[in-house]
Amino acid sequence: MDLFRAFSKPSSKDIAKERLRLILINDRCSMPQEVLEDIKEDILKVLSKYMEINYAEIDVRMTITEKVEEDPVALVANIPVKKVKYNK
């Protein structure tokens, strides 16, 4: 590890690479709201077979996560469950 490089400015190549990465991530995240609503409805349709859902507090969105470098775009769904239906 080169200690001097750790404190130096990033090179223009590294800056350009990071900017391109952010542009590509943003491009992947841009999805029409209608498509996201269709996905949300399909997910809720399936989940409602197995559980009662609090529809007032549902949050489904596309987001960028820094945890995964290869594919940082994620669909995040926060769906509060009231009760699990167990019918066998």
Swiss-Prot record:
Keyword Glycosyltransferase appears in the UniProt entry: no
Pfam families, per database record: MinE
Coiled-coil portions: none
Gene3D superfamilies linked to this entry: Cell division topological specificity factor MinE
GO biological process, one term: regulation of division septum assembly
Keyword Phosphoprotein attached: no
InterPro entries for the chain: MinE, MinE_sf
Keywords: Cell cycle, Cell division
Superkingdom: Bacteria
Cysteine disulfide links: none
Sequence similarity: Belongs to the MinE family.
Function: Prevents the cell division inhibition by proteins MinC and MinD at internal division sites while permitting inhibition at polar sites. This ensures cell division at the proper site by restricting the formation of a division septum at the midpoint of the long axis of the cell.
Protein's name according to its UniProt entry: Cell division topological specificity factor
Organism: Clostridium kluyveri (strain ATCC 8527 / DSM 555 / NBRC 12016 / NCIMB 10680 / K1)
